A protein has these predicted regions:
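Membrane-interface alpha helices of multi-pass inner-membrane proteins
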Residues: 158-177, 181-186, 294-299
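Short acidic/glycine- and proline-prone juxtamembrane loop motifs at membrane-interface regions
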Residues: 127-137
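Membrane-interface transmembrane helices that cradle and orient dolichyl/undecaprenyl
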Residues: 104-107, 144-160, 170, 195-196, ...
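Transmembrane-helix signature of polytopic, membrane-embedded enzymes
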Residues: 94-122
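Extracytoplasmic catalytic/substrate-binding loops of multi-pass membrane glycan-assembly enzymes
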Residues: 28-44, 54-72, 79-82, 223-227
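Specific aromatic-rich, kink-prone transmembrane helix
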Residues: 98-101, 137-154, 159-167, 186-190
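Perimembrane helix-loop-helix junctions
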Residues: 167, 180-213, 277-279
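Membrane-lumen/periplasm interface segments of specific transmembrane helices
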Residues: 202-245, 256-262, 269
């Protein structure tokens, strides 16, 4: 009876979180628009809907994931504004539920899981409201991080297999921040495998990665996308933009430290807890428990 009531409570929380996260993004998605950014994927999603292909029929620097997903929403709901915002609201609801699931698996009290997930839903997609590559890339990357954390916690190979798919969707939404997250998780996976003295999990990761790459190549072939077009538009051309921005970076104390001081302050309690655990147990750094906070710091 107790387990049944807990299960019903979980279902109620999940349903409430999805509805709230969906509605709040719908609200902010209809508050206003940016002349260029807001309509970018409305146009591209419609172009995919009528048969045009990214890279082949139109220049795509930001990544095709958002365009293809948006075309699905347009197909079922019609090419209208509500269908456009439904897309980002659905992603907001999906990542909110995943957040709740992850927190619950780390044995946080269910009321706290609900509260933190609720706060997450307010900060995840509503700042944009409408579908945008930065948010898709960040949130798909977050799902990849969630899968990695659950893999470390549960030792379930399924989560290890999911990581490349989420990170792949993130990369094909936008190259950054997905690339940074990919390297951080690869480092964490390498450290974990070294500590466990096994490459079994790396093998699962690589198998899943190869499957994802194979599916992407097949999809690109069926869509008639030339690899040279993809390489020029999505890999080489963005590097020219990145090079220009990198040369304009302000490598001063204010530019590197002071400007991000509140982000760095968040690391202080995390680093302190790890230091304290290392003092209490000299075996802490020799185990695998510290990999989770290490990944969080690297992110």
């Amino acid at each position: 009876m107790i387990e049944k009531s807990i299960s019903k409570k979980n279902i109620f929380f999940i349903f409430s979180l999805f509805v709230f996260s969906f509605i709040i993004n719908q609200y902010y998605g209809n508050k206003g628009v940016f002349p260029l950014d807001t309509f970018l994927h409305f146009d591209n999603g419609y172009r995919v809907l009528i048969g045009e292909i990214p890279f082949r029929d139109y220049w795509s620097v930001s990544g095709p994931t958002v365009d293809y997903i948006q075309s699905i929403f347009f197909y079922f709901l019609g090419a209208n504004w509500n269908a456009y915002v439904f897309h980002s609201s659905f992603i907001n609801g999906l990542t909110t539920i995943f957040t709740f699931f992850v927190l619950k698996n780390f044995n946080l009290k269910i009321n706290y899981c609900f509260l933190y997930s609720l706060l997450f839903s307010i900060l995840a997609y509503p700042p944009s409201g409408t579908p945008f590559v930065d948010h898709h890339s960040a949130l798909f990357s977050l799902l990849g991080v969630y899968s990695f954390l659950l893999f470390l916690k549960k030792k379930n190979k399924l989560y290890c297999l999911l990581i490349p798919f989420f990170l792949g969707l993130a990369f094909f939404s936008k190259q950054v921040p997905a690339t940074y997250i990919i390297f951080s998780i690869l480092l964490g996976l390498a450290i974990y495998s070294y500590k466990e003295k096994t490459f079994e999990y790396i093998n699962y990761f690589l198998i899943s990665l190869l499957i994802f790459i194979f599916l992407v190549l097949i999809f690109g072939k069926l869509q008639g996308i030339k690899f040279s077009d993809f390489l020029n538009q999505y890999i080489l051309y963005p590097q020219t933009i990145g090079t220009e921005r990198f040369t304009n970076l302000n490598f001063t104390f204010n530019g590197v430290i002071a400007h991000f001081k509140f982000i760095y302050l968040l690391f202080v309690p995390l680093i302190y807890v790890q230091y304290k655990k290392n003092i209490e147990s000299k075996k802490y750094l020799k185990g695998t428990e510290f990999v989770i906070p290490l990944i969080l710091i690297l992110l």
